[in-house]
Amino acid sequence: MSKQEKSNVEDKSLDIETAAQVETAQESASGALEELSVEEQLERAKDTIKELEDSCDQFKDEALRAKAEMENIRKRAERDVSNARKFGIEKFAKELLPVIDSIEQALKHEVKLEEAIAMKEGIELTAKMLVDILKKNGVEELDPKGEKFDPNLHEAMAMIPNPEFEDNTIFDVFQKGYMLNGRIVRAAKVVIVKN
């Protein structure tokens, strides 16, 4: 007999053995089922159903948690985008404040010559335009003269006695403060009354 014929014979005998093993396993499984009473089968089915229901509940719980997590992430992202929009110009606003300060200092001086008076009016209009642009972009001016001192909004540069005012009243403003959408960009530098 050739090698190929031997191989074919061996394969056929293996197939017959495998088929016999499968048939034996099926018979023993069906025999085992027949041996179980209807009550036992029902009990096993109930146990299986209970396990499946528990798994289903667990998956529902995990799905709800994942949904809540996604909602929290979405809200956090919206808040971050909103803050980026609101406070994105904060650095720009801080850099403009010294310009406003310089213009305001220049406007405090008395001017007598007609040309200088016209120049002062031009500077006043420029300052007003600059302040209006800042207001349009959410930058608010803090000029707290006469208000109560608030360390969150004001920086005390000096204290003076003055019986006409209550303690912690802002008597004078060295430098105005500014807020951007409710956040302090620069605290107002003030003189407060301390009797």
Swiss-Prot record:
<dbReference type="GO" id="GO:0006457">
    <property type="term" value="P:protein folding"/>
</dbReference>
<dbReference type="InterPro" id="IPR013805">
    <property type="entry name" value="GrpE_coiled_coil"/>
</dbReference>
<dbReference type="GO" id="GO:0000774">
    <property type="term" value="F:adenyl-nucleotide exchange factor activity"/>
</dbReference>
<keyword id="KW-0143">Chaperone</keyword>
<dbReference type="InterPro" id="IPR009012">
    <property type="entry name" value="GrpE_head"/>
</dbReference>
<dbReference type="GO" id="GO:0051087">
    <property type="term" value="F:protein-folding chaperone binding"/>
</dbReference>
<comment type="similarity">
    <text>Belongs to the GrpE family.</text>
</comment>
<comment type="subunit">
    <text>Homodimer.</text>
</comment>
<keyword id="KW-0963">Cytoplasm</keyword>
<comment type="function">
    <text>Participates actively in the response to hyperosmotic and heat shock by preventing the aggregation of stress-denatured proteins, in association with DnaK and GrpE. It is the nucleotide exchange factor for DnaK and may function as a thermosensor. Unfolded proteins bind initially to DnaJ; upon interaction with the DnaJ-bound protein, DnaK hydrolyzes its bound ATP, resulting in the formation of a stable complex. GrpE releases ADP from DnaK; ATP binding to DnaK triggers the release of the substrate protein, thus completing the reaction cycle.</text>
</comment>
<dbReference type="GO" id="GO:0051082">
    <property type="term" value="F:unfolded protein binding"/>
</dbReference>
<dbReference type="GO" id="GO:0005829">
    <property type="term" value="C:cytosol"/>
</dbReference>
<dbReference type="GO" id="GO:0042803">
    <property type="term" value="F:protein homodimerization activity"/>
</dbReference>
<keyword id="KW-0346">Stress response</keyword>
<dbReference type="Pfam" id="PF01025">
    <property type="entry name" value="GrpE"/>
</dbReference>
<protein>
    <recommendedName>
        <fullName>Protein GrpE</fullName>
    </recommendedName>
</protein>
<dbReference type="InterPro" id="IPR000740">
    <property type="entry name" value="GrpE"/>
</dbReference>
